[in-house]
């Protein structure tokens, strides 16, 4: 049984009701609908018919009017469409620049149906904007509205406006063009008034020169009526009168500027007038007398004595010699005095030149340096250094970077001993966070605990069990690839204690991040899997903790597994100096299970116990100092740095210097994603507001003066830039001999990369891993390595340099993928580091030329010889393998190769065959060898191309 459907607008026609009234009835009856074209069931339609009998439509009066005058029925619709027409606010943009009486016109424009009222602007302009406010006045225009109903449906496309301006026939085309221009330049709308459009266009061109001179005029003479034209800055420079009015108010210095500018900008459009004006300027500067200046300034300034005197004093220096005796005397005396001073200076300098310090006998260098820097250090001319290198067979320029060995060689020739400065170990723990002034205000602070260990030994899972959170599920492949800083509240002896945990990566590529974690920590928790034992990253973590002189607590994880052997783990750790307490050592070892949450309380108690022994204190009542744990560039928030406050308190609004970056702290977010106003010692927060992304591991400090912070950051940035340039020059240094030989052999290949990662630590880890790849035949060039998303600028750089873009845990900006497809740029995205390294190594191997490898086919023995007209045929017996026609063969006689050629003919039982297997006899003929003997061995082989690996390529060289 089908149910009938009725559309709402059909029902409205049937009931002679407006759609809005019918929709209102649907709302009262609770009937669902989307629009007036929706369908409803017959039952609902019957309900509506019953309700319509008693319904009093609120639009009854308009419907009655509509019967008498149909255009009025559509009057409410234009009120809605007026909002759409009002979007085209170009006419409003014209009015603010027009005279004040036009400001009253915009309220009349939003109502296009009232167009016939616009042609009477003189008197009715003011009352008619007030008329649309009332709802009743639309009745009088109902008589002339028979004409508007036709253009009413076309209100959105603007045919109604030309009807309004039919009186101005010539003004109709410009507004349509100007409707597109106003969004770019609202001033362009002035062109609607055609008689003044041309003048204003010329004005805009000449408005540039006098513009700076007029703002000062406005302040001193606010009451003058002539100040109204200055908004139109153009007409002022053309006539001389407005210029004289402006100069009256100018300063002393600006008077002379007006004198010069008047001649410079006079007749700006004509070249001849430029030359004349420039000549006049020169004549004014060189020849004009004080009396002539007085006449000129009287014309311009109205004989203002003060400004004339000032202009005279300003124009005195460029004057040539004048017959007045006073002026030439003073400059002559000055020149004599100045010459005497110069001579005395030269006399003073002459004895100082030979008094220079003698060359040093001992120098200390920090690394490679340029020839110019070496010459400055040893106090010798650059030419002498270059000559010394030339005699040693090294052609160098003044800006070339020299290796430490080369510097020692040059210094030895000059009789100077060289000492190389030792770099500080990065893993040493920072202890200078506390100053002597902090000793009187120390307070106990929470411990910073770093969880370290081999990859997949359960570090993050252990931290999850402590935090009761699922952090490991968010890491790609279950591998931690950042330093995560987490704040945990631990209950111990009925009291709440706070502990800050740092979760470091265990993958081998993240060595620098583990070293950084050990450097800022107070306690290191070494996680070792009970079923896996001590692994390479476990040993590395032990060395980092020992270098930082940090106490180590060993957590033997995964004891719930059947293959767990905790005692074997303890035995292995003793080989690296970690002896458990029960064996007489001083290392705390706790067997735990992160999944089963076993012995976690014991581990936390041990952490708090060691923290009490360490006496961890800080001064919270001072500006903050600490270390940048991690940093990255966020698409929405900008540079974001994870800071660990080690001393003092960091507050919102502080001026911060982190390495070579500085900024003001705009916001701080803790590990739970909540905004905080202050971060006390031992707390890690994300900080927003830095100008650039700082390097992970940099120390930060809060300063009170922004200028000092900026200067310190710029100084550090300059030092980093110099060291980076020196390292880049040293890394790309190639001798001429090796360069030419590699170029001849075609072995000089480069793979250009652009690396973008989520955080700075990932960038460091990937760069370190890439540098460990063999680069004997394929050199890796990282053109750009930075945190942040992949942008169109990166794509343009890759397209220009034929580079591959590598994205690690990052995204693409809008338009980057489209630009990459347009420029055929390869973008690779990864979230696990070892997959990235495998692909890069594969790409490098693909650039190597394939190797030609001999593949053995078989051997045959010559047992008979048959001379024929075409040549000598050797009757052979295949010993092993097979013989293939057209394969390469070697003929061995008494273990020596006597011929190498191609097997041109192969027959068996007088039939040509393609191959003969082992155990069969065959006839063999070679085109270029006929001296067969019985007992010769035929060695058959073929050459195949094989992809070369980086290891094999390096071994071959």
UniProtKB/Swiss-Prot annotation:
Keywords: Cytoplasm, GTP-binding, Initiation factor, Nucleotide-binding, Protein biosynthesis. Pfam families: EF-G_D2, GTP_EFTU, IF-2, IF2_N. Residues 34-282, 311-367 are annotated as: Disordered. Residues 453-460 are annotated as: G1. One of its GO terms (cellular component) is cytosol. One of its GO terms (molecular function) is GTP binding. Residues 478-482 are annotated as: G2. Residues 444-617 form the tr-type G domain. Residues 107-161, 209-242 have a biased composition (Pro residues). Signal peptide: none annotated. Residues 503-506 are annotated as: G3. GTP binds at residues 453-460, 503-507, 557-560. Residues 593-595 are annotated as: G5. Residues 557-560 are annotated as: G4. Residues 163-188, 250-259, 266-275 have a biased composition (Basic and acidic residues). It is found in: Cytoplasm. InterPro entries: EF-G-like_DII (IPR053905), IF2_II (IPR044145), IF2_N (IPR006847), P-loop_NTPase (IPR027417), Small_GTP-bd (IPR005225), T_Tr_GTP-bd_dom (IPR000795), TF_IF2_bacterial-like (IPR000178), TIF_IF2 (IPR015760). PANTHER family: TR-TYPE G DOMAIN-CONTAINING PROTEIN, TRANSLATION INITIATION FACTOR IF-2-RELATED. One of the essential components for the initiation of protein synthesis. Protects formylmethionyl-tRNA from spontaneous hydrolysis and promotes its binding to the 30S ribosomal subunits. Also involved in the hydrolysis of GTP during the formation of the 70S ribosomal complex. Belongs to the TRAFAC class translation factor GTPase superfamily. Classic translation factor GTPase family. IF-2 subfamily. This is Translation initiation factor IF-2. It comes from Thermosynechococcus vestitus (strain NIES-2133 / IAM M-273 / BP-1).
